[in-house]
Amino acid sequence: MSAKLKEHVNYIPGISSIPLVNIPFRGRNQQMTQRFLEAFSWVTKAQYLLFTAIYEFESKVFDVLKAKFSFPVYDMGPIVLNFDFGENTNHRDNNYLHWLDCQPRSSILYISMGSFLLVSSAQMDEIAAGLRNSGVRFFWVARDETSKLKEVCGHRGLVVPWCNQLRVLSHSSVGGFWSHCGWSSTREGMLCGIPFFTFPIIFDQILNSKLIVEDWKIGWRVKQDVGMDNLVTRVEIARLVQKFMDLENDEVKEFRTRASEVQRVCQRAIAKGGSSETSINAFIEDLSHCMVIEYKAAVLAKGRLEIDKSTFAKLEHKTKEIREDQPLPDSKKKKN
């Protein structure tokens, strides 16, 4: 890695110091980078800015954004659907859930590198061999490599083409999450209180890995050098996996404790009166208020003022139905 890429960027508002090499989009697909930059340029035209993140974990960023924009910025995270599973188990879940039921508590390393596999064949071979040599129990989701990996990995793990990730992460036998650090997977791991073994590949995954390892301190990196061409060897993988899943290791105990603390913050955020629920309610109130104002403006513009009183009353009644269960907070409190 060149000395230039090791330089730290410390002038982005709300973001802690970060090496230049970890900045998303640097030196990668230029066409894709241009599309992302174009999407970012639309933000200034927005009426609202919604994030599936939690204020408590990124308060500096949210404070900067709320100060910069004249429109409301809402933190609505983690927004994970169907977290309360109950007894709703699909029949195709039964085999791997039964396998998990038979494993010791916190003994399984769950591995998922996203829906769009960008890991090279050589790296996949090293990962499989490293897992086999580590002797650690694992559960690996690999859509297109299932048959091959079953042969290579040995009998200590289970390889499947698909699973209900939230159901697996919330299982008592799962003690670690080898993740590509996509934002959806990151949110789910946080909500389940699982420590991360990060393996970012591209774009925002790199920054998410930084948050996990350096800011929140709830995991380790598998890859120290970012980039698809940087191969992590089977020897290094076996060593890291063994240490990561060692429940008696003091360093491991520390980040497992912090992962549990992160889980509690997530649970408070989505609970009644939490930051996430408060933001969602404020957004709904703002939105319903704007609907009434815009409708009145449209009626006035068309010169139909005489027929609008009963119509306005009906519209206002409809918007109140959205928030009929409880009084909502004053939206002005969340705008800046």
What residue ranges belong to the model's regions?
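Nucleotide-sugar-dependent glycosyltransferase catalytic domains
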Residues: 1-167, 176, 192, 201-216, ...
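Acidic donor-binding loop of glycosyltransferase active sites
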Residues: 157-158, 172-185, 194
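Short glycine/proline-centered loop/turn elements that form peptide/ligand docking sites
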Residues: 185, 196-198, 202-203
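Polybasic, low-complexity terminal segments and linkers that are predominantly intrinsically disordered
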Residues: 300-336
